[in-house]
Amino acid sequence: MNKIGFNVLAWTAAVSDDLFPIIERLKGIGYDGVEFYLGPQEASAYQRMGNFTKDLGLETTTVMTVGKDDNPVSESAEVRQRALDKIKWAVDRAHDVNSKIICGPFHSGHTVFVNRPAEDREYALAGEVLNAAADYAAQANITFALEALNRFECYLCNTMEQLLKLVKAADHPNVRAMFDTHHSNIEEKKFSTALQTIAPVLAHVHISENDRGTPGDGQVLWDDAFSSLAAIKYQGWLTIEAFSRNDPAFANAIGVWREFSDPWDIAENGYRFIREMSLKHGL
């Protein structure tokens, strides 16, 4: 069975010792690992977290974003250099916490739009930054799992077809892709077609309901999602990503204006749901 993870953004975007009791409880539920947002905390906070999760017997994955001032598709070479520097910094923090995967939409600035569709030059610019960053990540055996977002958050990569184009532009074995059921539920015609498209470079999966609440409680076609993952013989992480207003600054940044589900309801029922669906579909 695939490893099951939980993204602690349901509680906070900050990596700190305050997460220790939450992570212990997630371990008790049965999770194989936890996922952290790579925010501006000191290296020592990540190192303590890395030691703590290792001692608990939990693996880790990480997620990051970039914005207007460190946008890999900016026309400004200075801004693109800041993007490269930030991704390298994230690699160091991921290494501190023992993560071998950095996922997320760090190919372009989150909610940065230019009032036109993406152009080939922008894929080339992002690919250049990601290729250089991946050379650095490879030294720590870290893989990038790039994420396509819905049209309201990103214009460079909304679909698996666009994401595959970006991965090819980066042209590096450590640059791969991820699949998020929330975004794909908005942008793709069918999960099966989307997953067949991205299968050759798929490295990570986020299990996320249409309303960002408890998986299985909403409108996502979960049988299609899990059967399609089984059809491509996916063997990576199945990590729940759900949000709340527990961290107001982060919630405001991603447009979370109300509570969807209690985080522990998400964690407990979501874990059971993933196991049931995985067994049902032979994943």
Model-inferred region functions:
Residues 20-40, 90, 96-100:
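Catalytic domains of carbohydrate-active enzymes, especially glycoside hydrolases
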Residues 69-74, 110-116, 153, 186, ...:
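A short acidic, helix-capping loop that chelates divalent metal ions and anchors anionic groups
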Residues 42-52:
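Active-site-adjacent beta->alpha loops and helix N-cap segments on the catalytic face
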Residues 32-33, 59, 100, 143, ...:
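Residue-level detector of anion-binding/catalytic polar loops
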Residues 1-27, 98-100, 157-179, 184-283:
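Histidine-acidic metal/acid-base catalytic patches
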Residues 60-62, 103, 146, 179, ...:
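Hydrophobic residues in well-ordered beta-strands that form the structural core
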Residues 10-12, 38-40, 66-69, 106-110, ...:
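Active-site-proximal loop/turn and secondary-structure-junction residues that shape catalytic pockets
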Residues 55, 77-176, 261-265:
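Active-site acidic/histidine proton-transfer and metal-coordination neighborhood
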